[in-house]
From Swiss-Prot:
O-acetyltransferase; part of the gene cluster that mediates the biosynthesis of protubonine B, a hydroxylated and diacetylated cyclo-L-Trp-L-Leu derivative. Within the pathway, pboC catalyzes the acetylation of protubonine D at the hydroxy group to produce protubonine C. The first step of the protubonine B synthesis is performed by the nonribosomal peptide synthetase pboA that catalyzes the formation of cyclo-L-Trp-L-Leu by condensing L-Leu with L-Trp. InterPro entries: CAT-like_dom_sf (IPR023213). It comes from Aspergillus ustus. Belongs to the plant acyltransferase family. This is O-acyltransferase pboC.
Length: 470
């Protein structure tokens, strides 16, 4: 099993309909009876060897009420969701760029005191890895999903959800074959040597790693950090990309950049402007990408961690001096160059060798690096999760909302990004029914105040320019 990730992933989804928990429980139980999907109910067990404590899976011969394949808890309220002190504050899309709320405020809707929060909490108990908390109101439903990050990454979670939904809709023939008990990534260390990694010169030595850790310690010493959701209208992202493409066209160079490239470049420059790091430092921008289509395409479905970062390393002064198209294109080039099969092999060789020798992965960047990490979960289709077969009653009338029956109107990740050990972490949770981008970031509280001022200014400028709402 993947023994690197100790984080617990916690996702919370709000539905503006009444969703029956029993239908979800039955369909999930059925999924765990199909082929290798029964692995999802495995227990984590420690296994000691010369390299220290590692972990492995033990799969019960049969799942029973006393030894289930997953935990599915329920809470039911006779009132509407608007009367609940926590669930009533779950964010909704606003008309313009907006900061929607602190995700930690909603953690109580998922894991409860005493529930596992780290891999070791699972390893020394007999608990299954999948936890669900289903809260039903008379007009809405909140579902919290929790699992150790070693079980699934964002894209793997999307594969799991699509398989579950296929069973819920009675389409078991659409459930993909899940990989067996061998690690599909094991061959990735057999290709190019670590020295072929394009950023090999940016691998930090132990002294540089200590300096890097000191920078991180200093940055977090006097200021608390907070995760919040920033919702970005579809039209704003389209305008950003159009402006970037115009700038690139005028330069007579490469012209393709994706929405993700542009969104990441805009956020990185904005965060640099409000955080104010020394301009002679380096920006280390880590854009996580899915390796399945390149390195695991011949394998059955693989849900464990299969993402690595495409790193862009640039002087901060240059990032802020050049137009946004410069950083967007650098992000695109880094992704194209580093997602090749030889680079994936070299990266895995580097990291696995380090883990085997020291128990820790190597740090890539600069000793004074201002590090940001970003992951785009849009292809996990969290906002397109169709639970309509389990919807027993419509909550909010369809004419008053943009979502279809049984689709989520809010998606949050309550996992604190501080676990990632970087200065600023973020992810794209996906696009809602109107095409608006839901992103989530970890910043200092003072920086959130500055970002709110910037977004208000942008909204005012766009409203003035268009002569209508943003």
């Amino acid at each position: 099993m993947d023994c690197v990730c100790d984080e617990t992933m916690e996702l919370i989804l709000r539905f503006d309909d009444v969703i029956e928990p029993e239908k979800l429980r039955q369909s999930l139980g059925r999924l765990l009876e199909i082929g290798n999907w029964r692995k999802l109910g495995a227990r984590v067990r420690p296994r000691e060897n010369n390299a220290g404590v590692k972990f492995e899976y033990h799969i019960p011969e049969k799942y029973t009420e006393t030894r289930p394949g997953f935990i599915y808890r329920e809470s039911k309220y006779s009132d509407g969701i608007s009367n609940h002190p926590t669930a009533s504050r779950l964010p909704r899309q606003h008309s313009g760029l907006s900061i929607l709320g602190a995700t930690q405020d909603f953690a109580s809707l998922g894991l409860q005191p005493g529930d596992p929060r780290h891999l070791a909490d699972w390893a020394y108990t007999d608990l299954p890895q999948l936890f669900f908390h289903h809260t039903t109101f008379k007009d809405a439903t909140v579902i919290a999903m929790t699992y150790p990050h070693s079980l699934m990454d964002g894209m793997g979670h999307g594969t799991f959800l699509r398989a579950w939904i296929a069973v819920l809709h009675g389409r078991e023939d659409e459930v993909p074959e899940l990989g067996g008990f061998e690690d599909a990534r094991s061959h990735l260390t057999e290709g190019a040597p670590a020295t072929k990694y394009l950023l090999h010169q940016y691998i930090l030595g132990w002294y540089q790693t200590i300096v890097f850790g000191c920078w991180r310690f200093i940055e977090t010493l006097w200021s608390s950090e907070e995760d919040r959701v920033v919702c970005i209208p579809r039209q704003f992202v389209q305008e950003l990309r159009a402006n970037v493409l115009d700038e690139l066209d005028s330069g007579k160079g490469e012209t393709f950049v994706s929405n993700n490239d542009v969104l990441l470049a805009w956020f990185a420059r904005t965060i640099l402007s409000i955080a104010g790091p020394l301009r002679n430092r380096s920006l280390v921008l880590m854009n996580s990408f899915n390796i399945r289509s390149v390195a695991l395409s011949s394998q059955p479905a693989f849900i464990n961690n299969a993402v690595i970062p495409a790193c862009t390393i640039l002087p901060i002064w240059k990032v802020l001096r050049e137009p946004m198209s410069f950083l967007a294109m650098q992000v695109r080039r880094s992704l194209v160059q580093q997602r090749g099969l030889d680079q994936i092999h070299a990266w895995y060789k580097l990291m696995v060798s380090s883990l085997e020798q020291t128990g820790r992965p190597r740090v890539i960047g600069t000793s004074d690096g201002f590090t940001m990490i970003f992951s785009n979960w849009d292809k996990a289709s969290l906002f397109r999760l169709d639970l309509s077969p389990a919807a027993s009653e419509m909550g909010l009338p369809l004419g008053q909302r943009s979502t279809q029956l049984g689709y989520p109107s809010c998606v949050l990740c309550t996992t604190p990004f501080s676990m990632l050990g970087v200065r600023s972490g973020g992810c794209c949770l996906g696009k809602d029914a109107e095409g608006n981008w839901w992103t989530q970031w970890r910043l200092r509280r003072t920086e959130w105040d500055r970002l709110e001022t910037i977004l208000e200014t942008i909204n005012h400028q766009r409203q003035t320019h268009t002569g209508k709402g943003v």
